[in-house]
Amino acid sequence: MAERSQNLQDLFLNSVRKSKNPLTIFLINGVKLTGVVTSFDNFCVLLRRDGHSQLVYKHAISTIMPSQPVQMFDGEESQGA
């Protein structure tokens, strides 16, 4: 059975969506958005904060900074001891 490959962007967004990890999104115009990713597709990200949803187009995103470390792959262990 062939394993379906995913791109890094989808792995990252799916991980923060599943973990409900709060994040900050910086747009290319300098606007800073914070919230939790509830859904995403090829063109946009649905961000939720304080009971309100915002649809953010990916072409407007500059940087995404999660508030906690992101575990993107199953079996990934913490670094250090």
UniProtKB/Swiss-Prot annotation:
GO CC field: cytosol
PROSITE patterns hit by this protein: SM
Sm domain residues: 10-70
Domain of life of the organism encoding this protein: Bacteria
HAMAP family for the chain: Hfq (MF_00436)
Function noted in UniProt: RNA chaperone that binds small regulatory RNA (sRNAs) and mRNAs to facilitate mRNA translational regulation in response to envelope stress, environmental stress and changes in metabolite concentrations. Also binds with high specificity to tRNAs.
Record note on quaternary structure: Homohexamer.
Protein family: Belongs to the Hfq family.
Name of the protein: RNA-binding protein Hfq
Lineage per the UniProt record: Bacteria, Pseudomonadati, Pseudomonadota, Alphaproteobacteria, Hyphomicrobiales
Gene name in the database record: hfq
